[in-house]
């Protein structure tokens, strides 16, 4: 990330970065046949994955974690995740839901 002195410029830079993130959303089978929703492609150096995961867990009323550069949510939330990420400022066009 380039060095930015003005806080307003830094905020604008983060907004531009959000609009450029290619995000992939898919499900995986976890232990005992349970399903988890995986969100990857969000740059963990620029964004706090823990904070994003916390907001998503609250909105979806589920458990989850942020680890290994991706967010894992308990359950299948593919139908709602695109709208929620768009509300957080990510471009809906760059969110791929499988």
Swiss-Prot record:
Keywords: Protein biosynthesis, Translation regulation. It comes from the Archaea. Pfam families: SUI1. The keyword Protein biosynthesis applies. The keyword Zinc-finger does not apply. InterPro entries: DENR/SUI1_TIF (IPR050318), SUI1 (IPR001950), SUI1_arc (IPR022851), SUI1_arc_bac (IPR005872), SUI1_dom_sf (IPR036877). PROSITE patterns: SUI1. One of its GO terms (molecular function) is mRNA binding. Transmembrane segments: none annotated. GO terms for biological process: formation of translation preinitiation complex; regulation of translation; translation reinitiation. Belongs to the SUI1 family. This is Protein translation factor SUI1 homolog. It comes from Pyrococcus abyssi (strain GE5 / Orsay).
